[in-house]
Amino acid sequence: MAHTIKSNLSEHIIKIDVYGCGGTGSHVLNGLARMAKALNDLGHPGIHITAYDPDVVSYDNVGRQAFYDADVGQNKSKVLIQRINLYYRQTWRAITKEAPSSSKADIAIACVDTISSRSKIAKAKYKSGAYIIDCGNAKASGQVILGQYQGELPFPYEENRDLVEGEEPDEPNCVDQYYRQDLFINSMIAGHALHFVWSLFRRTSLDVRGVFTNLERGITNPIKC
Protein backbone atom coordinates (compact mmCIF):
# COMPACT_ATOMS: atom_id res chain seq x y z
CA MET A 1 0.00 0.00 0.00
CA ALA A 2 1.43 3.37 -0.99
CA HIS A 3 2.56 5.80 1.70
CA THR A 4 1.19 9.33 1.43
CA ILE A 5 3.96 11.87 2.00
CA LYS A 6 3.31 14.68 4.48
CA SER A 7 2.35 17.78 2.48
CA ASN A 8 4.08 20.21 4.85
CA LEU A 9 7.50 19.14 3.55
CA SER A 10 7.00 21.64 0.73
CA GLU A 11 5.74 24.50 2.88
CA HIS A 12 8.76 25.56 4.95
CA ILE A 13 12.49 25.09 5.45
CA ILE A 14 12.98 21.42 6.31
CA LYS A 15 15.36 20.49 9.13
CA ILE A 16 17.50 17.44 8.42
CA ASP A 17 19.89 15.77 10.86
CA VAL A 18 22.78 13.67 9.55
CA TYR A 19 24.33 11.30 12.09
CA GLY A 20 27.81 10.23 11.04
CA CYS A 21 29.94 12.01 8.44
CA GLY A 22 32.25 9.21 7.35
CA GLY A 23 32.00 6.68 4.54
CA THR A 24 28.32 7.12 3.73
CA GLY A 25 27.57 10.33 5.61
CA SER A 26 30.19 12.41 3.80
CA HIS A 27 28.66 11.47 0.44
CA VAL A 28 25.15 12.11 1.79
CA LEU A 29 26.13 15.62 2.90
CA ASN A 30 27.61 16.50 -0.47
CA GLY A 31 24.46 15.21 -2.15
CA LEU A 32 22.23 17.23 0.19
CA ALA A 33 24.15 20.37 -0.78
CA ARG A 34 23.32 19.73 -4.44
CA MET A 35 19.74 18.94 -3.48
CA ALA A 36 19.39 22.23 -1.59
CA LYS A 37 20.46 24.13 -4.70
CA ALA A 38 17.99 22.20 -6.86
CA LEU A 39 15.12 22.74 -4.41
CA ASN A 40 15.80 26.47 -4.27
CA ASP A 41 15.81 26.61 -8.07
CA LEU A 42 12.40 24.90 -8.02
CA GLY A 43 10.98 27.45 -5.60
CA HIS A 44 11.16 25.34 -2.42
CA PRO A 45 12.02 27.24 0.81
CA GLY A 46 15.05 24.95 1.22
CA ILE A 47 16.64 22.67 3.79
CA HIS A 48 18.80 23.22 6.85
CA ILE A 49 21.27 20.52 7.85
CA THR A 50 22.79 19.74 11.22
CA ALA A 51 25.62 17.20 10.93
CA TYR A 52 26.89 15.21 13.91
CA ASP A 53 30.22 13.40 14.20
CA PRO A 54 32.87 13.43 16.96
CA ASP A 55 35.61 11.85 14.82
CA VAL A 56 38.52 13.51 13.04
CA VAL A 57 39.71 12.81 9.51
CA SER A 58 42.56 10.31 9.29
CA TYR A 59 44.79 9.56 6.32
CA ASP A 60 42.93 6.25 5.89
CA ASN A 61 39.71 8.20 5.24
CA VAL A 62 41.07 10.10 2.25
CA GLY A 63 39.81 8.58 -0.99
CA ARG A 64 37.21 6.23 0.45
CA GLN A 65 35.35 9.06 2.15
CA ALA A 66 34.75 12.57 0.77
CA PHE A 67 37.91 14.06 2.27
CA TYR A 68 41.25 15.36 1.02
CA ASP A 69 44.80 15.27 2.38
CA ALA A 70 44.40 18.82 3.68
CA ASP A 71 41.45 17.68 5.83
CA VAL A 72 43.49 15.20 7.90
CA GLY A 73 43.31 16.05 11.60
CA GLN A 74 40.14 18.12 11.34
CA ASN A 75 36.72 17.13 12.65
CA LYS A 76 34.68 15.38 9.96
CA SER A 77 31.42 17.25 10.44
CA LYS A 78 33.11 20.65 10.69
CA VAL A 79 35.31 20.34 7.62
CA LEU A 80 32.44 19.10 5.44
CA ILE A 81 29.95 21.72 6.63
CA GLN A 82 32.47 24.55 6.34
CA ARG A 83 33.18 23.55 2.75
CA ILE A 84 29.49 23.29 1.86
CA ASN A 85 28.64 26.60 3.54
CA LEU A 86 31.42 28.30 1.59
CA TYR A 87 30.66 26.80 -1.81
CA TYR A 88 26.86 26.79 -1.59
CA ARG A 89 26.32 29.86 0.64
CA GLN A 90 24.54 27.89 3.32
CA THR A 91 24.41 28.33 7.10
CA TRP A 92 24.34 24.66 8.05
CA ARG A 93 25.62 23.49 11.45
CA ALA A 94 28.29 21.00 12.46
CA ILE A 95 28.15 19.38 15.89
CA THR A 96 31.31 17.59 17.01
CA LYS A 97 29.37 15.06 19.07
CA GLU A 98 27.40 11.87 18.53
CA ALA A 99 23.69 11.91 17.69
CA PRO A 100 21.56 13.73 20.30
CA SER A 101 19.06 12.12 22.66
CA SER A 102 16.25 14.21 21.14
CA SER A 103 15.76 15.98 17.83
CA LYS A 104 13.31 18.42 16.25
CA ALA A 105 14.36 17.46 12.72
CA ASP A 106 11.79 16.66 10.06
CA ILE A 107 14.15 14.04 8.59
CA ALA A 108 17.01 12.19 10.31
CA ILE A 109 19.57 10.21 8.33
CA ALA A 110 21.67 7.68 10.24
CA CYS A 111 25.02 6.91 8.60
CA VAL A 112 26.78 5.18 11.48
CA ASP A 113 28.57 1.84 11.40
CA THR A 114 28.36 0.52 14.95
CA ILE A 115 25.56 -1.15 16.86
CA SER A 116 26.19 1.10 19.87
CA SER A 117 25.73 4.25 17.78
CA ARG A 118 22.57 2.87 16.18
CA SER A 119 21.21 1.94 19.60
CA LYS A 120 21.54 5.55 20.76
CA ILE A 121 19.78 6.77 17.63
CA ALA A 122 17.04 4.17 18.14
CA LYS A 123 16.45 5.32 21.73
CA ALA A 124 16.29 9.03 20.88
CA LYS A 125 13.09 11.08 20.81
CA TYR A 126 11.96 12.64 17.53
CA LYS A 127 9.05 14.69 16.28
CA SER A 128 5.92 12.63 15.81
CA GLY A 129 5.87 11.54 12.18
CA ALA A 130 9.51 12.48 11.54
CA TYR A 131 11.13 10.46 8.75
CA ILE A 132 14.08 8.31 9.80
CA ILE A 133 16.47 6.84 7.23
CA ASP A 134 18.97 4.17 8.25
CA CYS A 135 21.99 3.57 6.01
CA GLY A 136 24.31 0.64 6.51
CA ASN A 137 26.62 -1.64 4.61
CA ALA A 138 28.89 -4.65 4.74
CA LYS A 139 31.70 -5.51 2.28
CA ALA A 140 29.73 -5.13 -0.94
CA SER A 141 26.15 -5.02 0.22
CA GLY A 142 23.97 -2.75 2.27
CA GLN A 143 20.57 -1.36 3.06
CA VAL A 144 18.70 1.91 3.13
CA ILE A 145 15.49 1.83 5.18
CA LEU A 146 13.02 4.71 5.33
CA GLY A 147 10.65 4.76 8.28
CA GLN A 148 8.93 7.11 10.67
CA TYR A 149 8.93 7.88 14.36
CA GLN A 150 5.36 7.39 15.59
CA GLY A 151 4.07 7.55 12.03
CA GLU A 152 2.46 5.47 9.32
CA LEU A 153 5.72 3.78 8.31
CA PRO A 154 7.50 1.40 10.72
CA PHE A 155 10.36 2.75 12.82
CA PRO A 156 13.49 1.19 11.20
CA TYR A 157 14.98 -0.10 14.46
CA GLU A 158 11.81 -1.73 15.74
CA GLU A 159 11.34 -3.58 12.48
CA ASN A 160 15.02 -4.56 12.06
CA ARG A 161 16.33 -5.50 15.50
CA ASP A 162 19.56 -6.87 14.04
CA LEU A 163 20.63 -3.26 13.41
CA VAL A 164 20.78 -2.55 17.15
CA GLU A 165 21.57 -6.00 18.57
CA GLY A 166 24.50 -8.39 18.23
CA GLU A 167 28.27 -8.08 17.98
CA GLU A 168 30.12 -5.02 16.75
CA PRO A 169 31.81 -5.37 13.33
CA ASP A 170 35.61 -5.39 13.21
CA GLU A 171 37.24 -2.12 12.21
CA PRO A 172 39.42 -2.56 9.07
CA ASN A 173 42.86 -0.96 9.06
CA CYS A 174 44.33 1.05 6.19
CA VAL A 175 45.99 -2.02 4.67
CA ASP A 176 42.96 -4.29 4.40
CA GLN A 177 40.09 -1.78 4.17
CA TYR A 178 40.04 -2.02 0.38
CA TYR A 179 39.78 -5.81 0.58
CA ARG A 180 37.14 -5.86 3.29
CA GLN A 181 34.87 -3.19 1.84
CA ASP A 182 34.15 -2.30 -1.77
CA LEU A 183 35.41 1.17 -2.67
CA PHE A 184 32.04 2.32 -4.00
CA ILE A 185 29.56 0.69 -1.61
CA ASN A 186 29.29 3.84 0.53
CA SER A 187 28.53 6.14 -2.37
CA MET A 188 25.99 3.60 -3.66
CA ILE A 189 24.18 3.54 -0.32
CA ALA A 190 24.32 7.33 -0.12
CA GLY A 191 22.75 7.57 -3.57
CA HIS A 192 19.78 5.44 -2.52
CA ALA A 193 19.30 7.48 0.67
CA LEU A 194 19.41 10.75 -1.26
CA HIS A 195 16.87 9.42 -3.73
CA PHE A 196 14.41 8.80 -0.89
CA VAL A 197 14.95 12.29 0.54
CA TRP A 198 14.46 13.81 -2.92
CA SER A 199 11.29 11.74 -3.37
CA LEU A 200 9.87 13.09 -0.10
CA PHE A 201 10.08 16.57 -1.59
CA ARG A 202 9.09 15.85 -5.17
CA ARG A 203 6.38 13.19 -4.91
CA THR A 204 3.05 12.85 -3.15
CA SER A 205 3.36 9.15 -2.32
CA LEU A 206 5.85 6.30 -2.10
CA ASP A 207 5.47 2.67 -3.12
CA VAL A 208 8.98 1.73 -1.94
CA ARG A 209 10.47 2.61 1.45
CA GLY A 210 13.88 1.04 1.22
CA VAL A 211 16.33 -1.16 -0.63
CA PHE A 212 18.72 -4.02 -0.05
CA THR A 213 21.57 -3.89 -2.55
CA ASN A 214 24.49 -6.15 -3.43
CA LEU A 215 27.22 -4.86 -5.76
CA GLU A 216 28.89 -8.23 -6.33
CA ARG A 217 25.65 -9.85 -7.47
CA GLY A 218 24.34 -6.76 -9.25
CA ILE A 219 21.05 -6.97 -7.38
CA THR A 220 18.89 -4.34 -5.69
CA ASN A 221 15.69 -5.49 -4.01
CA PRO A 222 13.02 -3.00 -2.92
CA ILE A 223 11.30 -2.81 0.46
CA LYS A 224 7.72 -2.03 -0.44
CA CYS A 225 5.38 0.12 1.64
Residue positions per predicted region:
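Conserved beta-strand segments of alpha/beta enzyme cores
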Residues: 48, 91-93, 131
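Phosphate-handling active-site elements
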Residues: 39-44, 204-206
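N-terminal Rossmann-like NAD(P) cofactor-binding module of classical short-chain dehydrogenase/reductase
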Residues: 109-110, 133
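Glycine-rich phosphate/adenylate-binding loop
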Residues: 2-24, 28, 104, 115-118, ...
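Glycine-rich phosphate-binding loop and adjoining beta1-alpha1-beta2 segment
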Residues: 45-88
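A structured beta-alpha segment of the ubiquitous adenosine-cofactor-binding alpha/beta core
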Residues: 72-105, 112-117
